[in-house]
A protein has these predicted regions:
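Extracellular/luminal ectodomains of secreted and membrane glycoproteins with large N-terminal domains
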Residues: 1-6
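Conserved eukaryotic protein kinase-like
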Residues: 7, 11-392
């Protein structure tokens, strides 16, 4: 009995020792792999920073005296009074109001050092540096100092178009009257026409939306935020793209569903059309919170009104001239949001239609309901394409 007990205890001790040794060994392996992963990430971080630095230096060398001014981080802190006056914040970082030495006001976009690998930053600097147009925001300078990055723009007193579209007022009066809305829509169209045709290198924006349209003191619109832009030669009708670019609600169908057509400058046309419809309605194009289900998809509801030659019932229309202006903006936008890219007009044609007479516009085909979900965009980014299109 005693020998049996001793044998059992001996085996138990061996098992316990073995379990402890296995646990220690496993912990050592986990620690080893953790250190290796951290070392790899650290190495990639510094390699990425070094690559970004080389790209910036190459950019400055190529542009010479035409490159925007480069500021160091201490100058950025000084012009923003140590980041005292914050204008806004987003996933990219924060925007602060600043003042240059000559007294001019600027908006300083300080990028989040943890977001992205610097590609969007370099992309924006390179894109805007190629532009010079009244309807495109001007880059006053930039800061690139290690992981500290900032973009310095001319200050726009009226902020983004977004706040003038969706913010409700108790008296149900539009914040922007129809003459200004038309002026803004036409200005954005001219800015996009310039990006597509007026630059030596064609610039496709890929993120046209109210938030990215800034307004100066006279409500002159400026296209901003070129972080997702793509540069291509004018002779290129179709561009290659590895992942989805843009914002849900404004993304052209072909960007998510490649079988619908090639990605091109017509993708910006679609985003423009969706944005102008929101300007017209003072609401999101897809809104499940409306009273009547027929109004959930705003473009379809507007199409029905025009097809039946009924009043658009839009807020703030005071006379026949404004009624014609609103109807024209809707008609042009419905052409812009056609699912087939080949059916959409170029931005040059959009400008022509907006400047022309309403009775010269033909009735566009009925629009399809197309609104990609976040899961569809995510699936595109990992290489699979899904599509959702329905006639409503």
């Amino acid at each position: 009995m005693f020998n049996l007990y001793s044998l059992i205890m001996h085996d138990f001790t061996l098992l316990s020792t073995g379990a402890v040794l296995c646990t220690v060994g496993l912990l050592v392996l986990l620690f080893f792999f953790r250190e290796k992963i951290l070392r790899y990430k650290c190495l990639r971080f510094w390699e990425s920073n070094a690559e970004d630095h080389q790209n910036i230096e190459a950019f400055l060398k190529n542009y010479g005296s035409y490159a925007p001014k480069r500021y160091n981080y201490s100058e950025v802190k000084r012009m923003t009074s140590c980041f005292k006056n914050k204008l806004g914040q987003g996933g990219y970082g924060s925007v602060y109001k600043g003042t240059l030495q000559n007294g001019s006001h600027v908006a300083v976009k300080v990028l989040n050092g943890l977001k992205g690998n610097g590609e969007e930053f370099i992309n924006e600097v390179a894109s805007i540096s190629r532009t010079s147009h009244v309807n495109v925001v001007s880059l006053e300078g930039f800061c690139f100092e290690g992981c500290k990055r900032a973009l310095i723009y001319k200050f726009m007193p009226n902020g983004s178009l977004e706040k003038f579209i969706y913010e409700e007022r108790s008296d149900s009066v539009r914040q922007l009257g129809w003459p200004i809305l038309y002026k803004v829509a036409l200005g954005i169209a001219r800015g996009l026409e310039y990006l597509h045709r007026g630059c030596t290198t064609r610039i496709l924006h890929f993120d046209i939306k109210p938030h990215n349209i800034l307004l100066d003191e006279d409500f002159c619109p400026k296209i901003s935020d070129f972080g997702l832009a793509k540069l291509c030669m004018k002779k290129e009708s179709i561009v290659s793209m590895l992942g989805a670019r843009g914002t849900i609600g404004y993304i052209a169908p072909e960007i998510v569903c490649r079988n619908l057509g090639g990605v091109s400058h017509k993708s910006d046309v679609y985003s423009y059309g969706m944005m102008v419809l929101e300007m017209v309605g003072g609401r999101k194009n897809v809104d499940v919170g409306v009273d009547r289900t027929s109004e959930i998809y705003f473009p379809h509801w507007l199409y029905q009104r025009i097809e039946l030659d009924e009043e658009l019932q839009l807020i703030g229309i005071m006379n026949e001239e404004e009624k014609e202006c609103a109807r024209k903006m809707v008609m042009v936008s419905l052409w812009c949001i056609q699912t087939d890219p080949s059916n959409r007009p170029s931005m040059s044609k959009v400008v022509e239609m907006l400047e022309g007479k309403l009775d010269s516009l033909q009735m566009p085909p009925k629009p399809y309901l197309y609104s990609p979900s976040r899961s569809e965009v995510d699936s595109l980014e990992v290489g699979s394409y899904q599509c959702s299109r329905s006639n409503v």
